[in-house]
Amino acid sequence: VGNPIAVSKDLSRTAYDHLWMHFTRMSDYENAPVPTIVRGEGTYIFDDKGKRYLDGLSGLFVVNAGHGRHELAETAYKQAQELAFFPVWSYAHPKAVELAERLADYAPGDLNKVFFTTGGGEAVETAWKLAKQYFKLKGQPTKYKVISRAVAYHGTPQGALSITGLPALKAPFEPLVPGAHKVPNTNIYRAPLFGDDPEAFGRWAADQIEQEILFEGPETVAAVFLEPVQNAGGCFPPPPGYFQRVREICDQYDVLLVSDEVICAFGRLGTIFACDKFGYVPDMITCAKGMTSGYSPIGACIVSDRIAEPFYEGGNTFLHGYTFGGHPVSAAVGLANLDIFERENLTQHVLDNENAFLTTLQKLHDLPIVGDVRGNGYFYGIELVKDKATKETFTDEETERVLYGFLSKALYENGLYCRADDRGDPVVQLAPPLISDQSTFDEIEGILRTVLTEAWAKL
């Protein structure tokens, strides 16, 4: 038996032996070192050898305020000394109350009720359960189904995974929760119709939701789950008028609109809540990641007064909760993180610089492997193709060889941590910390240009 307090000198080997990494093909590291990050500062991270990398993904769309914010660490320390833990099961504590009020103030319309979770998948799970129980309390028990979009990722809990539109991700865990149905997403680059008319395409895409509601029966559909900008597949922004039409459809058929903003909230697109940027008011917002910039885990489902109302009547109870939901340390860090957002005006910084980021990435269009550059705010995807004219994508063999076998590793070795993703057509995803400026954009573009040029030679 080893000494339990001994510190391993070979973190990489110990990681392979004991740390089961998430969404990771573990055999890749049987004879290769596990990348090990030990420190962060601003827009950069550093590995155990001291090498610096630009964090082009904010960890995992999380570290919005940047790395190394000592005041957030100090906030966590002080809160842990005062009240390290207490649940919000029939009790309150000050930081949960204050953060709930703050989120309600930021949220649009009458979204004033905040149900805390510990992460985004749990927030989505909460929203579906809440929608189901809401309609039961309203005397409409057959309304339990949900509609979401093809290739969309909404989390890994059983319900959230059902809402997810990635068959390969779901197959190992079937049967999943029944009642989750899919419609086309807003990928205009590969639009089956109206590819040259964004407004018409948006109307068509929204109308597919209506068609699915009518096909299933409005009396059976509880909610529609949509990300403001869809992540999986490579950053699909909404076409003009899309969300306004979706809101009309949901109102017409008494269906709840859930804005899944686990990635898009807290400045990623230049507003605290992304629904504000696109001009719609949902019935619920799910959020997490950037709420604390990752300095402590927390998530939330923010609910309109109208939807919360029956749960506040008589003996009714929302029969759901999490031990660590609304954790005092996380709530305190969330408040301090939002203080930074306001003091440094990070949302306006994103709005002021998003066009410069896009323009810099669009320089890559001169590379034969780059088919599309799309996104919003500080959230972009670069779709890779074999043929610009036909938009021909990679074969499975080419994806394995070029995307996994070369691109992911080469970007990292060249000093850029980001994501090469094939949950749809192959894309490189970028979401740097919100403090990023033109120098960051130029560094990203330079590394991408070098590595994508090499990748093209390997096709």
What are these regions, as identified by a protein language model?
Residues 2-459:
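Conserved N-terminal phosphate-binding loop of PLP-dependent enzymes in the Aspartate aminotransferase
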